[in-house]
A protein has these predicted regions:
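Short beta-strands and strand-coil junctions in structured, solvent-facing domains, enriched
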Residues: 73-75, 112, 192-197, 291-293
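Short solvent-exposed strand/turn elements
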Residues: 116-137, 297-309
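Extracytoplasmic/secreted envelope proteins and their assembly/folding machinery
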Residues: 149-153, 183-186, 252, 265
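Glycine-rich, acidic and aromatic/proline-enriched surface loops and short helix-turn segments
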Residues: 145-162
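Assembly/oligomerization scaffold segments
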Residues: 1-124, 254
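An acidic/polar, Gly/Ser/Thr-rich interaction patch typically located in mid-to-C-terminal regions
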Residues: 47-78, 215-309
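Short beta-strand-centered interaction patches in the first periplasmic/extracellular domains
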Residues: 101, 113-132, 158-245
Length: 309
């Protein structure tokens, strides 16, 4: 069965509400999209998704660049900075259901006319990493005596994915960690109880634009715990990259891989592949990015941390 990617892009107005309605940091949007772009009707769309640091430079999140080709010249009159954009995809022509990729806030649209007569609109969509959410006042401000998992869940309710070994998740916080905001909480536990925190795609079934993935360097697990990248259309044998990190010059092994685009592979997942010598390499996904087009290739690009490190 041949892959035939199509995309649906929805544009929403952000709902005007009282400050108390958004004190949790969630954005409220109108129920019905004001514009829907569906590539099944002949529209050419190119999308790239990359990693960037948010206004809080300790949190890395996603940014999408969408290029729409040959739309009506007045298209930009119907969208505005701050609109909420949702992006969906499907892999096969016979499929009816579109799966969610990401949502975010629209930046300033850029239009370009080409000598060939083509016309493009370039849209910058940034994963919503809300200042309201990071600076909201916490009810529980002291975390000493709690497990790392319970502390994270109390600060990031319904927004957390904890990709850590059980030992690390259940570790008791024995330091005097006091934080009045989520921003302060991350400042104090990162590098002590967690290795990294990354904002990633949220769940389309709610108003939450992003979730926060908490990771530690995890140990190697049994083979059955790993997803084989070959099952997801591995495009080439991953390339090895060796870096020296930290003040103790720790040697780290990473791999760069590329598979057919899917929403079923996420940061923190355990994945494996067979190298050129026939050996199974076990890794953890460190970063993801994507190149998508309904007229070209659709790839998910992975940075993998070797679990043998």
């Amino acid at each position: 069965m041949l892959l035939s990617y199509d995309f649906k892009i929805e544009f929403y107005n952000e709902k005007q509400s009282l400050e108390k309605d958004t004190s949790s940091g969630d954005s409220l949007i109108e129920e019905t999209p004001k514009i829907i772009i569906n590539t099944q009707y002949g529209i050419h769309v190119d999308i790239s998704i990359s990693n960037m640091f948010s206004n809080y430079n300790f949190v890395k999140s996603k940014q999408a660049k969408i290029v729409l080709w040959n739309l009506p010249l007045d298209f930009n009159d119907h969208i505005k900075v701050g609109d909420i954009v949702k992006i969906y995809y499907k892999k096969f022509a016979h499929e009816k259901k579109f799966d969610f990729i990401m949502a975010g806030y629209l930046g300033t649209p850029m239009s370009t006319d080409y000598p060939s007569g083509d016309f493009s609109v370039e849209l910058d969509v940034r994963l919503a990493v809300s200042s309201n959410f990071f600076n909201r006042k916490l009810e529980n401000k002291s975390f000493k005596g709690m497990t790392v998992e319970d502390a994270i869940k109390s600060v990031f309710p319904d927004r957390n994915t904890i990709n850590m070994d059980e030992k690390d998740r259940l570790q008791i916080i024995d330091k005097n960690i006091y934080a009045s905001t989520p921003k302060e909480f991350i400042d104090k536990i990162k590098g002590v109880y967690i290795h990294d925190v990354i904002a990633d795609y949220g769940n389309n079934n709610s108003n939450v634009e992003c979730i926060y993935i908490f990771t530690n360097d995890r140990t190697t697990e049994p083979d059955e715990k790993y997803k084989a990248l070959e099952d997801y259309g591995l495009e080439f044998i991953p390339q090895q990259e060796i870096t020296i990190e930290g003040e103790y010059s720790i040697r780290r092994i990473y791999w760069n891989a590329q598979i057919f685009y899917t929403h079923k592979i996420k940061i923190g997942d355990k994945v494996s592949f067979i190298d050129g010598l026939g050996k199974m390499i076990k890794t953890t996904i460190k970063e993801t990015s994507a190149r998508l087009s309904n007229t070209g290739d659709c790839s998910l690009i992975l940075k993998l941390k070797d679990d043998s490190n």
